[in-house]
From Swiss-Prot:
One of its GO terms (biological process) is erythrocyte differentiation. It comes from Mus musculus. Belongs to the ETS family. This is ETS translocation variant 2. The gene is Etv2. GO terms for cellular component: nucleus.
Length: 335
């Protein structure tokens, strides 16, 4: 094919539907007749015509329900008798929200439950039918709701009255002894048996709160161990300054008269006082001197040469630096 002289290719033609039918027959394909006759009118599709040809659906249920005859009062099936009673009552705000079942007859030889004939707040007894549908019926007049009144007598006893005109029975009584050492007795009369629980009496001062004793012990502890005004753990150089400012300790430590220089006159006593402050009874001068050597490279405490047990404070002690600026030397105070 010549690229410089080429003619535009003709468009491909699609054969009509009548020709497609014959063409598909050669290869075994089926082509629907898509060609429209010239005299076939095109009308809009209506609702009735558009559903023609679809199979009609059967909306009847496959398994029809049997007709259940309606009863005004379904028969309640009793449950087996059980001594373990659970909460069978319904919520008083919505008595229709739950359904319970009535217990069956009690077997011979067992006492009736105190809850037989119990009713809800609406005066109706719930029952459950065979289909599980709760039904409510009005009870007979003999099962009417009984109200109980409570009254307290002059002797401290509690009386319960059911409002039927009978005698009031003492159902609950508590007696408390007022004097020290008396017995406190609590008595219940439940109709089945009498229960009494004795309690040994105790004197009222014995039931004191431990706050007073704790405060007294804390106060004694503060009085015993509060020997300094420093906040937090005290350091060794601070303790030595405290002893130097205390005139009563001049026999064990004192200023030498030179600037910031002091001498340990009794090193054992100073070590003992330091161990008492830090609550270390095994403190001695060897351990104290190791603590002082720790301050050498920090310019807090330095060793003075030529004299034994003689040290001086360095320039990083803020209290002594302030006194030097004001013109008051520590050595002048001791002289």
């Amino acid at each position: 094919m010549d690229l410089w002289n080429w003619d535009e290719a003709s468009l491909q033609e699609v054969p009509p539907g009548d020709k497609l039918t014959g063409l598909g027959a050669e290869f075994g394909f089926y082509f629907p007749e898509v060609a429209l006759q010239e005299d076939t009118p095109i009308t809009p599709m209506n609702v009735e015509g558009c559903w023609k040809g679809f199979p009609e659906l059967d909306w009847n249920p496959a398994l029809p329900h049997e007709d259940v005859p309606f009863q005004a009062e379904p028969v309640a099936h009793p449950l087996p008798w059980s001594r373990d009673w659970t909460d069978l009552g319904c919520n008083t705000s919505d008595p229709w929200s739950c359904a319970s079942q009535t217990p069956g007859p009690a077997p011979p030889g067992t006492s009736p439950s105190p809850f037989v004939g119990f009713e809800g707040a609406t005066g109706q007894n719930p029952a459950t039918s065979a289909g599980g549908v709760p039904s409510w019926s009005h009870p007979p007049a003999a099962w009417s709701t009984t109200s109980w009144d409570c009254s307290v007598g002059p002797s401290g006893a509690t009386y319960w009255d059911n409002g039927l005109g009978g005698e009031a029975h003492e159902d609950y009584k508590m007696s408390w002894g007022g004097s020290a050492g008396s017995d406190y007795t609590t008595t219940w009369n439940t109709g089945l048996q009498d229960c009494s629980i004795p309690f040994e009496g105790h004197q009222s001062p014995a039931f004191t709160t431990p706050s007073k004793s704790n405060k007294q012990s804390d106060r004694a502890t503060l009085t015993r161990y509060s020997k300094t005004n420093h906040r937090g753990p005290i350091q060794l150089w601070q303790f030595l300054l405290e002893l130097l400012h205390d005139g009563a300790r001049s026999s064990c430590i004192r200023w030498t008269g030179n600037s910031r220089e002091f001498q340990l006159c009794d090193p054992k006593e100073v070590a003992r006082l330091w161990g008492e402050r830090k609550r270390k009874p095994g403190m001695n001068y060897e351990k104290l001197s190791r603590g002082l050597r720790y301050y050498y490279r920090r310019d807090i405490v330095l060793k003075s040469g030529g004299r034994k047990y003689t040290y001086r404070f360095g320039g990083r002690v803020p209290v002594l630096a302030y006194q030097d600026d004001m013109g008051h030397l520590p050595g002048a105070e001791g002289q």
